[in-house]
Amino acid sequence: MGRRAKMVEQVVSLMETHDQIRNIGICAHIDHGKTTLSDNLLAGAGMISKDLAGDQLALDFDEEEAERGITIYAANVSMVHECQGKPHLINLIDTPGHVDFGGDVTRAMRAIDGAVVVVCAVEGIMPQTETVLRQALKEKVKPILFINKVDRLLNELKLTPEELQNRFMKIIADVNKLIEKMSPEEFKGKWVVNVMDGSVAFGSAYHNWAISVPYMQKTKITFKDIIDYCEAENQKELAEKAPLHAVLLDMVVTHLPNPVEAQKYRIPNIWKGDLESEIGKAMVNCDPNGPMAGVVTKIIMDKHAGAISACRLFSGRIKQGDELRLVSIKAKARAQQVAVFMGAERVQVPSVSAGNICALTGLKEASAGETVCSPNTILDPSFESITHVSEPVITVAIEAKNTKDLPKLIDVLRQIAKEDNTVRVEINEETGEHLISGMGELHIEVITNTKIGRDAGVEVDVGEPIVVYREAVNGVSPEVEGKSPNKHNRLYFVAEPLDECVYNAHVEGLIKDEDFKKKTPKEVETKLVEIGMNREEAKRVMTIYEGNVLLNMTRGIVQLDEARELIIEGFKEAVKNGPLAAEKCQGVKVKLMDAVFHEDAIHRGPAQLIPAVRTGVRDAIAQANVGLLEPIQNVYISTPQDYMGDAMKELSNRRGQILDMEQEGDMTTIKSKAPVSEMFGFAGAIRGATQGRCLWSIEFGGFEKVPTELQPQIVKEIRTRKGLKTD
């Protein structure tokens, strides 16, 4: 039997022993060494050749990833590691660190119970490290720390042992500060990482060695030995004495929870149903014999097998041919194949039980975040939707070069929207022009060149990138009337800014649009009061839609109940296209103050009420001192002091604001923010300005008001582009 076949056999037998399973992710800032680390773990576990590890980047198996040298998608793999005399099954997900692909990280967090946070010893904590840690802790995923690229501190920066220790202490303190700040209440103080207990390891993923205090005690290697090996440039021998996979996977097994332990506190966090019900108990206890329930965390397109769903099972088991229910879209599907991931390959297995991550084919309708369960299980509500911290801020229009490719292009776009819920796709079959909104230039480029051009073979024309703006109100409008086309129905609205606490809670995912479908009015009211809304107003909330709220302030209007859905529909249409530039509104509170309806239902149908509400709400917003908001990016630049002036000049030319500066040695770190609209082509420009000597990264920083002097011009440009009147 080949080594690989033996590995598959081990994986299958270990799937049933829950205390020997670990579902883990590796997450970090871009280029801090996640994929190199993953490769060496695989090599240690016998999955790929040791000589190739680190160069092979087995989990970057997409051509686009290999070419760019970065991880774009989250890759999955299962492997076996011997620890404390017992074999353990480790399901590993390697996630991207580039800010444009953060959506993949968010979805991967739903599938795992523990995370190895990788921090580069040279750069320290970076913005994306903080973002991925926040996502992990929000999903109650326990972190451990690996400080990578330690050899560079010795060989390049020539730090003394004392400076080395100080650098490590600073990184550990910074990580713990973030963990303490963002941990769920019950884990404050318990989840901090600690050198002495072995929840921190140091090493070099590229040179394949690592060390932790427990491993030092076991092997009698000292820190002085490590310094000597690095300075003598003999890291190969060090890798034999302290192999990366042994140190790291021991740390994973010792410090990260198995699925039975993790699901006890993770299920109440992601599922708001009755935990005492049969399905509730089965999920909390990770029961393989209970009803089947799981969540699709990722959709992968395969040329031969079609859509493959990566699924984390919380209870029950899935066999080939099982019928499944897709809860959110109320559809049925059949699991045509059940497999485990081995990097780019999938290996078929007879069945997969609770607590594991598997690959399913046959779930054509499923999208990332979908809840799956057995057909006779009532899993209500479905799992909490997977919320992501950033928003799509750049849009491009695309058209097929050949009209015969149009149907194919529409299929591909629908598939992309299912695979990646951070992409917004608007399909216009009449004009043939379709809009894709993504997280940044690179995100859009990968979608248009790779997913549409390379994978689907559709040639497309891509328009100039357009920035996504928002509209918001800064004052309170008078009472504004909306009349139906037949003049028999009148509704009166007031628009004003939404309370900041409510808007922030919506951004953080504490209240969601779908709460109004899933929860009782009383539950919604309690939740709104908890986050700081006035109880009188909380009672009267009709709906929340994309960060805007509609309240019913009327009393005793008989026909209002039957008109309710139409009023909500009209409100949604109005805030989807604001009055200034037909951009989405955000942070607007609209109050329905009064309404007069025709007593005959035939005269107050959808064709009458929706336009009445739409014009009334839009006019109220227009009279509440409406202004434009633009998306902002936080920009972090680390540059040698000689080039600091050039880097700052490049930022100020792009309406950038310097927020903070820190100096360490001859390197300066600049923290700043700049509008997305000014950041096109920044990558090339900043490399030119600093002769390629700087490191830089960006992350989404929310929306801010457009400067008053620039607003008229921007509004005019948007309206012209959309074919609206500009006078």
Swiss-Prot record:
Question: What residues bind GTP, as annotated?
Answer: 28-35, 94-98, 148-151
- Functional description taken from the UniProt entry: Catalyzes the GTP-dependent ribosomal translocation step during translation elongation. During this step, the ribosome changes from the pre-translocational (PRE) to the post-translocational (POST) state as the newly formed A-site-bound peptidyl-tRNA and P-site-bound deacylated tRNA move to the P and E sites, respectively. Catalyzes the coordinated movement of the two tRNA molecules, the mRNA and conformational changes in the ribosome.
Its transmembrane ranges are none
Report the residue ranges that make up the tr-type G domain in this protein: 19-260
Gene Ontology molecular function: any one: translation elongation factor activity
**Keyword set, alphabetical order:** Cytoplasm, Elongation factor, GTP-binding, Nucleotide-binding, Protein biosynthesis
Among its keywords, does the record have Lipoprotein? no
Task: Quote the InterPro entries the UniProt record gives.
Answer: EF-G-like_DII, EFG_II, EFG_III/V, EFG_V, EFG_V-like, G_TR_CS, P-loop_NTPase, Ribosomal_Su5_D2-typ_SF
This chain is encoded by the gene named fusA
Q: Report the sequence similarity comment from the record.
A: Belongs to the TRAFAC class translation factor GTPase superfamily. Classic translation factor GTPase family. EF-G/EF-2 subfamily.
The identity of this protein, by name, is: Elongation factor 2
Q: Which GO terms describe its cellular component?
A: cytosol; ribonucleoprotein complex
Q: Where in the cell is it found?
A: Cytoplasm
Q: One matching Pfam family, short form?
A: GTP_EFTU
Q: Which domain of life is it from?
A: Archaea
Q: Which residues carry this modification: Diphthamide?
A: H603
- Whose protein is this, by species? Methanococcus aeolicus (strain ATCC BAA-1280 / DSM 17508 / OCM 812 / Nankai-3)
